[in-house]
A protein has these predicted regions:
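Cytosolic catalytic domains that perform sulfur/thiol-centered chemistry
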Residues: 1-93, 101-123
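Conserved Rossmann-like nucleotide-cofactor binding loop
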Residues: 97
Length: 123
């Protein structure tokens, strides 16, 4: 839910062009910019489609939303998911910083690609 600092979504490919690499909690997915006060519907639909897909296969899995320590973008996104009826959503306030400070490993990640069909329909 971090911003794609210095980066942008290439709407021709659905991929993000980043200015710097990003580390996160192993096994996590990155959906940049989905916690903004006003979120791009294209980005939000990419996130919710992925949540729906995970829930079809694993209906009891929690959805844990995080960013950096005390990042309000992740709080916004977790609240939006819960208000949209997604159950078992949690905000991990300590985020990547807290995970790393606890001595846990991080891994490099790239943002989730926006499906081209959605990009073309949003143009």
């Amino acid at each position: 839910f971090l911003p794609a600092e210095g980066g942008h979504l290439d709407r021709a490919s659905g991929r993000w062009a980043l200015a710097e690499s990003h580390d996160t909690i192993p096994g996590s997915l990155w959906f940049p910019e989905t916690g903004r006060g006003v979120v791009d519907p294209l980005l939000w639909s990419t996130l919710t489609a992925r949540v729906d897909a995970v829930r079809r296969d694993h209906p009891d899995w929690p959805i844990v939303v995080f960013c950096r320590a005390d990042c309000w973008m992740s709080w916004n996104a977790s609240r939006r998911l819960a208000r949209a009826g997604v159950a078992n959503v949690f905000w991990f306030a300590e985020g990547i910083d807290g995970w790393h400070d606890a001595g846990r490993a991080l891994m490099q990640v790239v943002p989730e690609t926006v499906p081209l069909a959605r990009v073309r329909n949003a143009s």
